[in-house]
C-alpha cells in the first residue's frame, strides 16, 4: 500500500477492525451480567438524555421534558508510521486504554462529580467537561465502616433501610476490595463465607467489588421498578482522530447513570 493511502479513512477502517477485540477486554472488566441495567441508544453522541426520575406520588409521575447531561470520556493511543500495517500490534496497544476507560467508567458510576480524584494518573479525558454534572451511587463521599462493624450486619441494615423506603429488589451490593475479601473469608474453621447468610437476599451474582471504592466502603441498591440504569448513547469504541505523521486513536464512550428513584440507594454504614 502506498504511503499516501494511510489517511483518516484508513485510520477509521483500522479502528473498526480492532473495535471488537476491545469490547472483549471491556466486558472482562465490567463483569457480566452488569449490576446496573444498561439502556443502549443509537450509537451516536447526544447532548442531553431523557431524565426518568420518578416522583413517587401517588400517583407516580415523571416530569415532562426533563433532561440530563451525559459524560463522554476517552483515552488516547498513537501508532507510529512504522506500525501502520501491524493490526495485531494496534489491537494490543489499545488494550491499556480500554482497561483505563473501564476503570474510569466504574469510578464515575460510583462517585459521579467527585470521581476526578480517582482518575488522577490515568490517561482519561473528559471531552465535554461534564464530569461536574454527573451523579454517582455514592450520594456523598462515603465513610469507612467502623472497624468493629461486620459487612454482613452492614448489608442487613442497608436492606432494612431500602425496604422501609418501599424498595422491593432485586438488591445489589458493591464494596471495596478489602471488604469483599473479608466477606468471602470463611468463619473460623468453617468453609462457609461470612457473607453467606445475606446472599439469598441479593440478586444472583449481586455482590461485587470495585477498585474505585475506598477502603471499607460500599453501597447497596435496588434495581427493581426501573430505579436506576445506565443510559449509553454510544458504547465503548475506537475512533481515529488524525493521521499526521503518526496516527492518533482514542478509546471513547458516552454514558449517563440515571438514578430514577433516589430511595433505591443506601451507602453502607
Positions of PLM-derived features:
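Helix N-cap / beta->alpha transition motif
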Residues: 74-80, 174-179, 222, 261
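Assembly/oligomerization interface modules of large self-assembling protein complexes
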Residues: 2-73
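Short, catalytically relevant binding-site loops at active-site mouths
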Residues: 114-119, 178-182, 256, 265-266
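Short helix/loop capping segments that flank catalytic or ligand/cofactor-binding pockets
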Residues: 106, 182-184, 259-260
